[in-house]
């Protein structure tokens, strides 16, 4: 993993002569004014783009709707294939691009749409145009979609501590160990997110009650087949975090709740 990361950074001219192996997974946070070429790679002198520099790491896009629509749409295929193929008149290149996409955004241009106490000053058309910058197919590829609400003063000032980051980290490590054991005989597969359809059928099948819950959600939210697979993968991970062998209905319900930005619910 480190060798591949070093090769990518070397080709991009971002590895110093006396630099040893990069031992930390990358975290890339490009500005929203980035061009399509800078994001995916290419150019007159071909170089890897941000999605390849984030290989085996995180690509963080702050203020997602502020990015160019073309830049966002070009992310769709790499999110599926974990690589990017760049074809030009003089060359065809393929770079690895197995990154974890994390994005943030405001609910509207002013930032107060659906706010419990502040008044949104945006016209409904402005809100819709703002949200429409994120296409349905791109949103479909985002496994966990969470709407953050303002934290009231009473919660901030509570003396009772919540779960510590160290405790959460320990649970995540244990879940990754469970997945490593599960896929020990599967070449190139190390986590639930990488499950093929056959592995999904083998390791992420809910019981009858869970299937009924999922069927209802699919019809109610008008979810796609891609969303169906991703809900199963997320619910399998939730079960792993609870050290549960089976996927229970509550695991599915939590995974379904993470689809709350799907197109049916946007802009009211």
Predicted feature descriptions by range:
Residues 1-4:
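Short, small-residue-biased leader/transition segments that mark boundaries at the very start
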Residues 7-16, 81-83:
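Post-Walker A helix-loop "phosphate-sensing" segment adjacent to the P-loop in P-loop NTPases
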Residues 18-21, 71:
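Inter-lobe coupling/hinge segments of SF2-like helicase ATPases
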Residues 21, 26, 37-59:
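Conserved alpha-helical scaffold flanking the Walker A/P-loop in AAA+ ATPase domains
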Residues 45-46, 69-268:
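Basic, amphipathic alpha-helical bundle interface domains used for macromolecular binding and assembly
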Residues 56, 62-63, 74:
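Walker B catalytic acidic pair
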Residues 59-60, 66-67, 153:
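Residues immediately C-terminal
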């Amino acid at each position: 993993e480190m060798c591949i990361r070093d090769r990518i950074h070397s080709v991009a001219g971002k590895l110093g002569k006396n630099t040893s192996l990069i031992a930390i997974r990358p975290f890339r946070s490009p500005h929203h004014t980035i061009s399509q070429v800078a994001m995916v790679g290419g150019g007159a002198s071909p170089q890897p783009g941000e999605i390849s520099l984030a290989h085996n790491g995180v690509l963080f896009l702050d203020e997602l709707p502020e990015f160019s629509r073309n830049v966002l749409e070009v992310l769709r295929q790499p999110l599926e294939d974990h690589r990017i193929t760049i074809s030009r008149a003089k060359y065809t290149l393929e770079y690895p691009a197995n990154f974890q996409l994390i994005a943030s955004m405001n609910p509207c241009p002013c930032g107060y749409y659906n706010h419990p106490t502040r008044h949104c000053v945006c016209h409904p058309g402005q809100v819709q145009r703002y949200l429409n910058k994120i296409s349905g197919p791109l949103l479909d590829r985002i496994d966990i979609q969470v709407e953050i609400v303002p934290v009231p003063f009473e919660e901030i000032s509570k003396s009772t501590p919540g779960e510590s980051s160290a405790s959460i980290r320990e649970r995540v490590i244990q879940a990754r160990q469970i997945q490593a054991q599960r896929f020990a005989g599967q070449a190139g597969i190390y986590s639930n997110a990488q499950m093929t359809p056959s592995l999904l059928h083998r390791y992420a099948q809910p019981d009858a009650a869970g299937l009924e819950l999922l069927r209802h959600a699919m019809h109610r939210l008008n979810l796609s087949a891609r969303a169906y697979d991703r809900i199963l993968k997320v619910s399998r991970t939730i079960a792993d975090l609870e050290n549960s062998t089976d996927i229970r209905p509550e695991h599915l319900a939590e995974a379904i709740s993470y689809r709350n930005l799907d197109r049916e619910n946007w802009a009211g």
